[in-house]
Design a protein with these regions (language model features):
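Binding-site signature for planar aromatic cofactors or substrates
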Residues: 1-215
Length: 215
């Protein structure tokens, strides 16, 4: 089949202005809970999101990460500060997120400013991770070139001996980020590509302007 022939109709739901919460975080939570309920029997990471960053030269990169927290400060994720995304955010602390739930014919796009999560909060999350994941945070020099997989596995085995108990400290180069949204767009697929799109834009008084966009 030709790529040009790959298409589908979107028929599940519509989205009206009166359906929207005045607070975009509350609106996101509503959609997220619906996604969890609808997709809980499928092998899908509902909290998976594409994180787009750019370095100081404006060269973009993107990858899928997992949402690990959400409050009035914003969207929280964790990573190695020395990774490509960590370097990008150090040079250019703005980023975008995309959540795509195709089974619900929905997408949420978010843009905002990024800051590091306070270290005590990052430590609490780090200590909640499985032992293997905590060891992997030490074993991986994320985004650096390595000789082969055996090198990585050997390092992991060394760390198992170095940290024989459940107590494994958080690496100093590992932690969390908060993306504080300034713009969010909620997209609902509709028939004939007449999709519903609503954008929230943060105003100087911290209120949110809600506008319908053309598909």
């Amino acid at each position: 089949m030709a790529l040009a022939d790959l298409r589908r109709e979107y028929t599940l739901n519509g989205l009206r202005r009166r359906d929207l919460d005045l607070d975009p975080i509350a609106q996101f939570n509503r959609w997220f809970e619906q996604a969890v309920t609808a997709l809980q029997t499928e092998m899908i990471d509902v909290n998976a999101m594409t994180l787009a960053t750019a370095d100081k030269e404006g060269c973009p990169s993107a990858r899928v990460v997992l949402l690990k927290g959400l409050d009035q400060r914003g969207f929280i994720f964790f990573t190695n500060y020395n990774s490509r995304k960590g370097h990008d955010l150090a040079e250019n602390p703005r980023a975008a997120l995309v959540f795509h739930w195709p089974a619900l014919e929905r997408q949420v796009c978010i843009a905002g400013d990024v800051t590091r999560l306070p270290s005590p909060e990052a430590e609490v999350y780090f200590n909640s991770r499985p032992r293997g994941s905590r060891l992997a945070a030490w074993a991986s020099r994320q985004s650096e070139v390595i000789r082969d997989r055996a090198e990585l596995e050997e390092k992991w085995l060394q760390l198992e001996k170095q940290f024989p108990s459940e107590t494994i400290p958080k690496p100093p180069y590992w932690g969390g980020y908060i993306l504080a949204p300034v713009r969010l767009e909620f997209w609902q697929g509709r028939p004939s590509r007449l999709h519903d799109r609503f954008r929230y834009t943060k105003q100087p008084d911290t209120s949110w302007l809600i506008e319908r966009l053309s598909p």
